[in-house]
Amino acid sequence: MTRIRQVSRPDLHPAAETIFQLIFGDRDPTVDPGTDTGSPGDWWPTFALVPEVFDHAVAGLALYRSSERKLDPQLRELGQTRVGWDVGSRFVFSQHCKSCRTVGISEEKIKSIPNWEESEVFNEIERAVLAYTDCLALNNGLVTDEIFQTLTKHLSDEEILELTYIVATYGMHGIISRALRLEFDADENQSLEEVEGDHQSLSQEHTEKRMEEIVNKEKSGD
């Protein structure tokens, strides 16, 4: 159970309604919880308590999925998944294990993220991204020159900034989720592992298709 109250569907601010339609259809998750990925879905009505916070968070989701991003989506997802593990958020870790599949990361690599240092499945830049993520989340941002030099060997300055911003943002989301006991972080004694559920709904293609359906529905007045 979440530690603070949630906003019911009829009381949402207008900008949130489209997002709720995308994720929940016509359901009110405070009454009928659940998402396609198997999560309760209480993150959304909790964040909706403060409309500006909700809108800011949603804008962050749109930012990392934007076609304007230079960073390889696979490197991004490795960082997002690992930072969920680092901060102990089952929600972030589980959701991004699923998201890894939508960008073509192999099951072998996904299963190796928790123990990446002992694994041989990651290449040089992937290992650097995972090491950099650990520095951001576990070492308060202190990064060795060796790790950073490996990043600069493979990534542009723009890509490094995108990686840093996105990973740090998802570290924050994991911390918030744990503090407020949202989603899969409701039980602080749970094991840190992926929760079974569909991953296709997290793909960019699925999101674009659902948004098109919602826009067409609004235009038709249904």
Specify the residue positions occupied by each region the protein language model found.
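Conserved alpha-helical segments that form or flank metal/cofactor-binding pockets of metalloenzymes
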Residues: V53-H56, E77, V83-E108
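Helix N-cap / loop-to-helix initiation motif
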Residues: L71-D72, G104-E108, S156-D157
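Short amphipathic alpha-helical segments at helix boundaries and their inter-helical linkers
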Residues: D32-P33, R90-C97, E117-Y132, L161-E183
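Short alpha-helical scaffolding segments that buttress acidic/His motifs in well-ordered protein cores
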Residues: W44-F47, A57-L61, L78-G84, I113-P114, ...
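Acidic/histidine-rich alpha-helical segments that form the ligand environment
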Residues: I125-Y165
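Secretory/endomembrane lumenal or extracellular ectodomains immediately following the signal peptide
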Residues: M1-L71, E193-D222
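Histidine/lysine/aspartate-rich catalytic loop segments that bind and position anionic ligands
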Residues: S99-N123
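C-terminal end-helix/capping segment
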Residues: R101-S106, S177-E208
